[in-house]
Amino acid sequence: MSNSIVIQTNSTVIEDMKQQYKHSLSPKTPQGGIFMAKVPSCTITAYKSGKVMFQGGRAEAEASRWQTVSQTPKTAVKKSVDSHRYAPPASIGTMSIVGSDEVGTGDFFGPMTVVAVYVDAKQIPLLKELGVKDSKNLNDDQITAIAKQLLHVVPYSSLVLHNEKYNELFDKGNNQGKLKALLHNKAITNLLAKMAPTKPEGVLIDQFTQPDTYYKYLAKQKQVQRENVYFATKGESVHLAVAAASILARYSFVKQFDELSKKAGMPLPKGAGKQVDIAAAKLIQKLGKERLPEFVKLHFANTEKALRLLR
């Protein structure tokens, strides 16, 4: 389902956005526009009026990244993303819960990793001491150092969807949102089985789609966790369980990515920018186009861009 969200912001934030999306800028800019950028499953268009439009399957997720820094009053962005019956209670930050998060969805090279973590309320001070916070604010070395300690402290379930399987499932009509839902649900149910008979006070999923859509994606699954499940964007700032899940998911992704680079016999860049197109073109020259599905998410625009570089 394609969404369209508009936020109102200022020129400073728009400049920050342009810098953030510099590797994804489109050469075309609409009339009255400052820039247009295309990232996986979302097109961002900023206008001189201060309006910024997000279109596509990840419109909500991309818009939510900017809503706290923009001058948007309490508008439809916040409402459309976080206003639902699955919103976490105000006290969730001090509860003993399972948190889940995913990494790798915006990277052309590499797998998708999802991790669910259980954090007992008594462990929250320890996690803070270990430096657990949003993994986006940590470099790979920091991630590795914290993750190695976390692995011995918290119960967790870690899943990796390798590129070949990812592409196979995508070709069968499963979009990225559905694949994420399947992995989150599987990681959560695996962890709950591992923890039994201990039961968490709740489950917090770092929200990537509307909860009703999430459960729609899981309609054919035999085992679906529904009891005390909450969804929130920027879940890592809501409870450290999500931040811990984010760190372990990134740690797993980095390890898998390093293995993939070794397999390719060349360094592979993260993200989905121009440097990725160049690396993919080199990889095709080196190993052949038929090997590409082992390394990349084929539905990304980078596939066609890499092939164009070789023509």
From Swiss-Prot:
Primary enzyme class: hydrolase
InterPro entries: RNase_HII/HIII (IPR001352), RNase_HII/HIII_dom (IPR024567), RNase_HIII (IPR004641), RNase_HIII_N (IPR024568), RNaseH-like_sf (IPR012337), RNaseH_sf (IPR036397), TBP_dom_sf (IPR012295)
Domain of life where this protein originates: Bacteria
GO (cellular component) term, any one: ribonuclease H2 complex
RNase H type-2 domain residues: 95-311
UniProt entry tagged with the keyword Transmembrane: no
Cell location: Cytoplasm
Cystine residue pairs: none
Family designation: Belongs to the RNase HII family. RnhC subfamily.
Name of the protein described by the UniProt record: Ribonuclease HIII
UniProt lineage: Bacteria, Bacillati, Bacillota, Bacilli, Bacillales
